């Protein structure tokens, strides 16, 4: 199994983990895990096109830069950027709590993003 497949599998597992965290009422944790699912999916897509970055911000930048060839819309890229910002707030912030509504939105965004990544990786093979 190559790195692309491993990253897609990891992304799918993280989506399932985020669902469990949501069901347990762990909304901040859910958002963080959902972001990491999107991150691994993004890395898989980029690797499929011979691109990579060592940082989260760099990965997001490359996703924006390569969005057309990856078959992503501006909205798809915005969801990844939003999830990254929320993950930072969830992990490090102390002033905001993540609501149930926001957590379910980020979780759904992650499910869609991971599926699009899976489709892009399969198309590129």
Swiss-Prot record:
Family that this chain belongs to: Belongs to the UPF0332 family.
Lineage, opening ranks: Archaea, Methanobacteriati, Methanobacteriota, Archaeoglobi, Archaeoglobales
Pfam families: HEPN
Organism domain of life: Archaea
Alphabetical list of InterPro entries matching this protein: HEPN_dom, UPF0332_toxin
The protein, known as: UPF0332 protein AF_0298
């Amino acid at each position: 199994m190559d790195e692309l497949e491993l990253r897609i599998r990891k992304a799918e597992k993280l989506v399932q983990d985020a669902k469990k965290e949501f069901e347990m009422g762990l909304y901040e944790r859910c958002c963080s895990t959902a972001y990491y699912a999107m991150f691994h999916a993004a890395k898989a897509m980029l690797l499929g096109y011979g691109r990579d970055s060592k940082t989260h911000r760099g990965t997001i930048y490359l996703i924006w830069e390569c969005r057309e060839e990856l078959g992503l819309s501006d909205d798809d890229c915005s969801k990844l950027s939003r999830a990254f910002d929320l993950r930072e707030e969830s992990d490090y912030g102390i002033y905001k709590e993540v609501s149930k509504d926001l957590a379910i939105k980020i979780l759904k965004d992650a499910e869609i993003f991971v599926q699009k990544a899976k489709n892009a990786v399969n198309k590129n093979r």
